[in-house]
Design a protein with these regions (language model features):
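Conserved donor-binding/catalytic core segment of Leloir-type glycosyltransferases
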Residues: 153, 186-204, 209-216, 222
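N-terminal subdomain of nucleotide-sugar transferases
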Residues: 1-12, 44-46, 64-79, 211-214
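A short beta-strand/loop micro-motif in the catalytic core of glycosyltransferases
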Residues: 82, 147-157
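Short N-terminal targeting/anchoring amphipathic segment
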Residues: 42-60, 79-84
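Carbohydrate-associated surface elements
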Residues: 158, 179
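Nucleotide-activated donor-binding/catalytic signature segment of Leloir-type glycosyltransferases, i.e.
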Residues: 230-251
């Protein structure tokens, strides 16, 4: 016996579409009536006991939280709202706690001071996009939709500490690391190399790792994954890129 599970998602094209859609997309990234209507159909059909939210900002938007709350009141169902925080979006409009122009770590928006996002051009280095990011954060701070979230799952203790800077979240967060299947240890041939697996992007610390690789030319580094900084990784003389590793044999054969 297991639990019944259903999923709802939506894709928004931020770069294509008509001129009208490009003009209206900033509003739709903040509040989506369409997402509320479509989610209501899922709620009425599935009648969930728990709604588990992931990365809803700018796509489904936090407006779906309001629809879940409305549905709960109208049906009398005790449906819990759980949110897994994969980044810092709820406390930082560019979700990275990092300025894309200076490449410096930044916590100026913590505590709800979202105007700093515009001052630093923190969303893609653009004033216009940063204004939209600031407006989105300020609107939902004013609206108070996040107070309806029952529990916030953070993927690390560090992420939890940053989420806890908002008193509204501090009593709701829990650190729960991403789980993996348990495997029995095996005897392997010892080889001298360093393995990185994950996305090749700035927020993952790839630039720092590349600098480290250059400082340690006698050590081999193996990279498993892909991402926007893949070209920089491929230029390493002591680095080997394996793409997405489907089995350990890809690494063992290196």
């Amino acid at each position: 016996m297991g639990n019944r599970v259903n999923a709802y998602t939506s894709d928004m094209d931020f770069h294509g579409g008509s001129k009208l859609s490009k003009l209206t997309y900033p509003i739709k990234t903040i509040y989506s009536k369409e997402a509320r209507v479509q989610l209501r159909k899922v709620l009425d059909d599935f009648k969930p006991d728990v709604c588990h939210l992931n990365n809803f900002n700018y796509q489904l938007t936090p407006s779906i939280i309001l629809e879940i709350v409305k549905w709960r009141k109208e049906t009398g169902r005790d449906c819990k709202i759980i949110f897994t925080a994969h980044d810092y979006q709820l406390v930082c409009p560019n979700h990275q706690l990092k300025n894309p122009i200076t490449h410096e770590n930044c916590e100026k928006c913590l505590g709800g001071h979202f105007m700093n996002c515009v001052k630093g051009k923190c969303v893609h280095g653009s004033t216009a996009k940063s204004i939209v990011g600031m407006m989105e954060a300020e609107f939902w701070k004013w609206n108070g939709a996040y107070k309806y979230i029952d529990k916030i799952i953070c993927c690390s203790e560090f992420l939890k500490t940053k989420m806890d800077t908002n008193p509204l979240f501090a009593t709701k967060t829990i650190a729960m690391h991403n789980f993996v299947e348990k495997v029995e240890p095996k005897e392997v041939e010892k080889k001298d190399y360093v393995l990185y697996f994950g996305r090749f992007s700035e927020e993952k610390g790839i630039n720092t790792l590349v600098e480290t690789c250059n400082l340690l030319p006698d050590i081999q580094f193996i990279f498993a994954g892909s991402g926007p900084l893949e070209d920089k990784v491929n230029q390493l003389k002591n680095g080997v890129t394996r793409g997405y590793v489907l089995s350990l044999s890809c690494v063992n054969n290196t």
